[in-house]
Amino acid sequence: MKPTLPNYDQSSVLIVGDVMLDRYWGGPTSRISPEAPVPVVKVEKIEERPGGAANVAMNIAALGGDAHLVGLVGEDEPAQALTTTLESLKVHCDFVALPEFPTITKLRVMSRGQQLIRLDFEDSFHDVAAEPIISRMQQALSSVKAVVLSDYAKGALEHVQSMIQEARKVNVPVFIDPKGADFERYRGATLLTPNMLEFETVVGKVKDEDDLVAKGQQIIEEFDFEALLVTRSEHGMTLLRRNMEPLHLPTQAREVFDVTGAGDTVISVLAASVSTGKPLDEACALANAAAGVVVGKLGTSTLSTIELAEAIHGSQDSGFGIIGEEQLISAVKQARARGEKVVMTNGCFDILHAGHVSYLNHAAELGDRLIVAVNTNESVQRLKGPGRPINPTDRRMAVLAGLGAVDWVVPFSEDTPQRLISQVLPSLLVKGGDYAIEDIAGGAEVIAAGGEVKVLNFEDGCSTTGIIEAIKGGRG
């Protein structure tokens, strides 16, 4: 199955669970302490990242979705740091602050890519009244299309069964990242995402694929789930649904550097995709592609729609299509090594029309490979004003990537692509319209590197503004 990227701007997910703050202190080590036989780390870098349920919310927000996060924190500095970080990422935080408990914090001391020690600051939340967290959930349910319950056995989901029932009352699907062998407490959930170890803890050792399916179906029936998504490391994922054939999704990871937070990414992409209207099988395929990206990164990591789009294009596209900046620079180097002439252009391409297609075909004829750099949503808004773009970045790029003339599509967030062009340095930079060569962003850098800059004519009578005005005026 090759899924298509949904518009995550339309997704809205409520995340309830164990939130935590991950702190990293890193630096070089060059000596052993005279006080004890331990290395001395000269701390040069300090990082803070949301963890647990907060990482799920951060993943959804990174895709462009609306993430509403409910959890338990203390009344302390880590809670303030966590809230500040999440709100800067456009996550709506609705925490229950409990002064008698500390905010769960994990401090890792790192050196030369290795973790030397982890210090946990926590006291699992226990005997916490249900009302504060349930009432926050009830208030949020009317404005979301999916619920994620992220369980790290720290106490936020002590009343998980009540939470499931609240979501079921309003027909909102509930996705759970489980913890422990007691699946009874999750009875009635839409879907659970156990990894293979968690699955076998409940059902016993799995002998083969048939045994996995049989035991999974038994779990679904016994606990009134609609589905299970079993994540299986190098064997990919298996989606099991009531009275349906299993769906086996092979792993898409090319290299595995760190599996930290991969489960959070899986459930966040799954829930966000379902909340946009994607069917469960396609949402799982998107989650599988996302997992293949994040395990190639160090630490808890999010991914962007650009990276996800690139992942679902897959290797069959031979590295072409939607691509990130680093991958583009590498691809251009390879093209030059093959003796190919690289042409580059840029624009908003908000509503693709015949003039655009003609222009891009002409540009492609001038070389062997054509790069189209596309303004992101924020960049278009600054240039064009309120109400633009009509189509979000991922959709504009998807349309451009589908044109035969275009080899690579890459986004840029600045007002002009000057920085990007100066990194890529194409053989030929083209721009449509009546620009003077010296006014074209990036032109000076291309010429200084021995390249060319050309201005191409647009087809008369075609413009995005004209199309928008015609639609507003009701003209065909």
From Swiss-Prot:
Its EC number is 2.7.1.167, 2.7.7.70. Pathway: Nucleotide-sugar biosynthesis; ADP-L-glycero-beta-D-manno-heptose biosynthesis; ADP-L-glycero-beta-D-manno-heptose from D-glycero-beta-D-manno-heptose 7-phosphate: step 1/4; Nucleotide-sugar biosynthesis; ADP-L-glycero-beta-D-manno-heptose biosynthesis; ADP-L-glycero-beta-D-manno-heptose from D-glycero-beta-D-manno-heptose 7-phosphate: step 3/4. GO terms for molecular function: ATP binding; heptose 7-phosphate kinase activity; heptose-1-phosphate adenylyltransferase activity; phosphotransferase activity, alcohol group as acceptor. The keyword Nucleotidyltransferase applies. It is an enzyme of class 2 (transferase). GO terms for biological process: ADP-L-glycero-beta-D-manno-heptose biosynthetic process. Pfam families: CTP_transf_like, PfkB. The keyword ATP-binding applies. HAMAP family: HldE. This is Bifunctional protein HldE. It comes from Aliivibrio fischeri (strain MJ11) (Vibrio fischeri).
